[in-house]
Amino acid sequence: MSASPRIGVLGAGGRMGRILIQAVQQAGYQLAAAVERPESSLVGSDAGELAGIGHIGVKISGSLVEVLKDCDVVIDFTAPVATEQHLKLCGDAGVAMVIGTTGFSEQQKQLLNETAHQTPVVYAANYSVGVNVTIKLLELASKVFGDSVDIEIIEAHHRHKVDAPSGTALMMGEAIAETLGRDLKQDAVYCREGHTGPRERQSIGFQTIRGGDIVGEHTAMFIGEGERVEITHKATNRMNFAAGAVRAAAWVVGREARKYDMKDVLGFNDIQV
């Protein structure tokens, strides 16, 4: 981990971008750059004032190319199309990336994997330490219950979220499926309507709720005969996501070029369940 990584925040004017700026400052690291779309009216504004923490002397830039030389790592919580361009630029420049964007196409996922051969990339659907502890608990529960229970995942988010199910819900499903030796693409059931017939034991169901200002809630249900185990994570604000992403940014600087996730950042791969 770099002692004082130079961190760039992409999508700095967005809700998550502003919180990331706060998190970088709270962690005592250097905010080297804050980037927005070239046409944004925020270009030229002070990043600290935008984030509500006062003047810090870092201006919002409209060009990632111009500021990459000042960064050891960038944090990207933007949109798939934007991240696609950022991957190409950071790969060519050899600048590490921490990516929290969700909703990628298969082609965009392939580009991410290719970029990780050029520069280190941390990619996770959720950077909350609590969520990643939850994933570890799901792996343990899956090992214990095996195929003896029905598994359902319920997720809830604010009304503005555009992808469903959430990346975190899919991450939970993938962790469960992998532990059970299943293929989530084959076993996932994303909606039920009409006469569906009896539930197939191998299926992993997903239910989505959208409304209000829910930051993020995820519950995995292991449903047996006569008992049910529920493992739940609830986020009450976004700082936990931002703090985890900043932790990942500090960790990834200087690592070899490959794709990492929060299991690597938190050392979970060394913990057996």
Curated annotation (Swiss-Prot):
Alphabetized Pfam families for the sequence: DapB_C, DapB_N
Gene Ontology CC annotations of this record: cytosol
Binding site for (S)-2,3,4,5-tetrahydrodipicolinate: H158, G167, T168
Keywords recorded for this protein, A-Z: Amino-acid biosynthesis, Cytoplasm, Diaminopimelate biosynthesis, Lysine biosynthesis, NAD, NADP, Oxidoreductase
Enzyme class: oxidoreductase
Family, as annotated: Belongs to the DapB family.
Protein name as it appears in the record: 4-hydroxy-tetrahydrodipicolinate reductase
Native source species: Acinetobacter baylyi (strain ATCC 33305 / BD413 / ADP1)
